[in-house]
């Protein structure tokens, strides 16, 4: 049986932390930032943990 291919789009968007959690970037901080407050842009920086409901599907896409 051939090897499973990981979903290349998912592999660019999600990383696995040291403890095994899936990490993602928050949406809404790429462009059109001029009208957003500094408070909002600060809230959107950093990484977030993927929802437990979405994690199994994403793990399957990553081949984990």
Curated annotation (Swiss-Prot):
InterPro entries: Ribosomal_bL35, Ribosomal_bL35-like, Ribosomal_bL35_CS, Ribosomal_bL35_sf. PROSITE patterns: RIBOSOMAL_L35 (PS00936). Transmembrane segments: none annotated. It holds the Pfam family Ribosomal_L35p. One of its GO terms (molecular function) is structural constituent of ribosome. The keyword Ribosomal protein applies. Residues 1-15, 23-33 have a biased composition (Basic residues). It comes from the Bacteria. Keywords: Ribonucleoprotein, Ribosomal protein. Residues 1-37 are annotated as: Disordered. One of its GO terms (cellular component) is cytosolic large ribosomal subunit. GO terms for biological process: translation. Belongs to the bacterial ribosomal protein bL35 family. PANTHER family: 54S RIBOSOMAL PROTEIN BL35M, LARGE RIBOSOMAL SUBUNIT PROTEIN BL35M. This is Large ribosomal subunit protein bL35. It comes from Rhodococcus erythropolis (strain PR4 / NBRC 100887).
């Amino acid at each position: 049986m051939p090897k499973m291919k990981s979903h290349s789009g998912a592999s660019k968007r999600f990383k696995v932390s040291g403890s095994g959690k899936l990490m993602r970037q928050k949406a809404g901080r790429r462009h059109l930032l001029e009208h957003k407050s500094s408070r909002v842009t600060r809230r959107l920086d950093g990484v977030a943990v993927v929802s437990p409901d979405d994690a199994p599907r994403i793990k399957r896409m990553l081949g984990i």
